[in-house]
Amino acid sequence: MQNFLLATIALSAHHAWALEIDLSNVTSINAAAKTAVEHVLAIYGVGNQSVSIPGIFPDPYYWWEGGLAWDSMVRYWALTGDDTYNDLVHEALLWQTGDDFDYMPPNQTKTLGNDDQSTWALAAMTAAEYGFPSPPDVTWVQLAQNVFNTQIARWHAETCGGGLRWQIFTFNTGYNYKNSISNGNLVQLAARLALYTGNTTYSDWAQKAVEWSQDIGLISEQGQVFDGSSTNINCSTLNHVQWTSAAGTVLTGAVYAANLDRLTSADTWASLVRTLVAGSDVFTSNDILYEVACEPSHNCNVDQLAFKAILVRALANTRDLTFDHQTTASHNESIPISTNGSAVTSGSLHDSINAILRTSARAAAASCSGGADGTTCGSVWTNATWDGSYGLGQELSALEVFLANLPAKVLINANSTTGSPTTSGNGTVTTGGNGSSTSGSAVVNTNDAVVNGKGSTLALVCGLGMAVMILL
C-alpha cells in the first residue's frame, strides 16, 4: 500500500513552480536538501504512522534501497549539520543488522544479494567516517567489518577465476551471475576499511577484487564498467549494459584506494580513477547525469531510478578527495591539479566533475516541480521540468546531487584524532587500526576554513596526520 505522499502526488496536478536552489548559497542548498529529505521520510512513513519495521521502506522498494537511503541521511546530517532525524536514522541502521551484526536479517533471505548486504555496510562506513553517534553494543565500523568477512568467505574462484556471485543463496535467481555492483561494492568497502583502520588486509582485497574485474573485462581499458556475466559460461561473454550504480561504486572504491597509493608514491589507483571518470562520460548529456541504459526509453525500474545517487556520490568523492590545492565552499572556482606531474588548469578533472555536479543539481531542482507542493522530484533531469514520475529513487538522486554542492567534511580514519577507528568487531572480524577511539566525536568542519579560498583544503585525513589529496 502506497503512503499518503505518493497518493497525494498521484492525484495532484503538475504545478509550474520548481524547487528553488542557489548554488552560491549554502542556506539555499540546505533548504533544497531538506525538502528532498522530507519527501524521503514521507515515503518511509514518517508523519502518517505507517512505519511497520524500522529501516525498511514500503513496497515497491527492495531492502537494499533502505541502506542507500540511510547512507544519504547520514551524509545529510554531516554536510548540513541538521540532526533532526538522527534518532530515526540510528534506529534504522541498527534494526536491520541481523542476529550476527552483519546485515543479514532473516526476513530478507528471499531477496538478499551480496550487493544488498554491502550497500548497508557502506552506510555503516559512512556513519563511521563522519563520526555519526555510535550505538552502545557495536560500532559502525564493526558492522562493516562483519559484512566484509562474510563476503570474502563467498569469493568463488571455481568459476570465472574468482569474484562474488550476485546472489548469496542458491535458490535466488541470479546466483549464477557475477556482477559489477556486488564486486564493486566489495572494492569500495575494502578500500574504505583499509583507509579507516590502516589494515593492509583490506587494501589487498580491494586490489584483488578490482584486478579480477579488469581481468575478465567487467572494467574495460577505457573505464567502462559493464554489468556482469554468467558462471554457466565461465564469464566468457559479458553483459555490456552500463549502469551508473556499478560505475559509481567502483569509482568511489578507486578514489579511497588512491589515497592509500599516495602514501607509497604509487599511481595505480589514481590512474584507474582518471580512466573511470573518462568512462563515466556515457552517463552525461550536456553535463547532466542520466541513466543511459533505461532513461531514454522510459523503462527504468524501481531499483534503477535510484542508481544515479551512487554515481553522484562517487563524482563528489572524486572531486573532494583528489586535489592538492585550495578550494572554496561552493566549489565554483577553477582548481589547478596535476596529471602525471604536469599542472593543468583548463579542462581539469576537477572542472569537468564540478560542471557535471553543478549543472545536474540545477537540472534536478528543475525536475522537482511535481506533486501537491510543486517540489516532488522526477527521474529525468534533462527535461528541465517534472517528468510525472515520483518515488524514493528520484528523491535520493536529487538529495545526493544537492549535497554534492555543499562544502565537504574531513573524514575520520586510523590516524585521525577524532572519531572511532577500532581494531575488532564482535570477536570474528578482521583486526585493523591502532585501537584508539573516541566514539561519537564530531568530525572536523572545513566550512570556515575554506569560505575565502584560504587555509584548509577539503580533504580526507590520512597518513602522518596530513591532509591527503591525490594528484590526478
Residue ranges and their predicted role:
Residues 183, 189-197, 201-257:
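Active-site cradle of extracellular carbohydrate-active enzymes
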Residues 90-91, 95-190:
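Extended ligand-binding groove/face enriched in aromatic
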Residues 249-285:
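Oxyanion-binding "anion nests"
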Residues 2-18, 460-467:
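Cleavable N-terminal signal peptides of Sec/SRP-targeted secreted and luminal proteins
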Residues 77, 128-132, 194-198, 258-265, ...:
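Short coil/turn linking the two alpha-helices of tandem helical-hairpin repeats
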Residues 19-118, 127, 136, 178, ...:
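CBM-like carbohydrate-recognition segments
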